[in-house]
Amino acid sequence: MSMAGKNYRNASAKVNRAQEYELAEAIEKVKEITTTKFDATVDVAIKLGVDPRHADQVVRGTVMLPYGTGKTVSVLVVCKENKAEEAREAGADFVGFEDYIEKIQNGWTDVDVIVATPDVMGQLGKVARILGPRGLMPNPKSGTVTMDVAKAVKEVKAGKIEFRVDKAGNIHAPVGKVSFDSANLAGNITSFIKEVVRLKPSAAKGQYLQGITISSTMSPGVKVKKDKFVA
């Protein structure tokens, strides 16, 4: 058995996979069982009682994590020259228009988030098939298609994340690093879950919030009690 497999098995032995823990206890469990030598990302997975095959049950949105993600987020702003300086001053890592569309057509996607102004979306549509599957296509609903590029860049850099339910009814999101103070992790996780609950579709029937699990990179999942998050 590899060392990674052995570590995972040892970590699993410390967690009752059937038990739901209070959030604070679940966070401490994740910290305890994380054995990676790097600062692992903490992820939240939420199981929802929705059928994403129906458009009126698709849950998607954004949330500003109060304590950030702990990750350095690289941002490309696709805009015309009149917005370029504003984007650079706000901290965008890459700024351009047709030159970056050409780079993307040639296979470049080495960026975490793309922000675009509405007047370039027609041209950016040329690379939608490349960006879409990677979750990089700008979207007005997530605030990444806007004339206020400075605000969009600053929010993304500060910890704004985008989420969307998958075909199985699950939502996954990174909410910080294992090195974060436990209270800060709890604040990020609570903000994320509350926003998902707020976005409950009116068409969703039965129990909406069906399960919450937190984990770190390469660690087993730890279940979290749902009662405090159910309206």
Swiss-Prot record:
Q: Which UniProt keywords apply?
A: Repressor, Ribonucleoprotein, Ribosomal protein, RNA-binding, rRNA-binding, Translation regulation, tRNA-binding
What InterPro entries does the entry give? Ribosom_uL1_bac-type, Ribosomal_uL1, Ribosomal_uL1-like, Ribosomal_uL1/biogenesis, Ribosomal_uL1_3-a/b-sand, Ribosomal_uL1_CS
Per its UniProt record, what SUPFAM superfamilies does this chain match? Ribosomal protein L1
In which domain of life is the source organism classified? Bacteria
Give any single GO term for biological process. Answer: translation
A GO cellular component term found in this entry reads: large ribosomal subunit
| Quaternary structure and partners | Part of the 50S ribosomal subunit.
- Protein known as: Large ribosomal subunit protein uL1
Q: Which organism is it from?
A: Chlorobaculum tepidum (strain ATCC 49652 / DSM 12025 / NBRC 103806 / TLS)
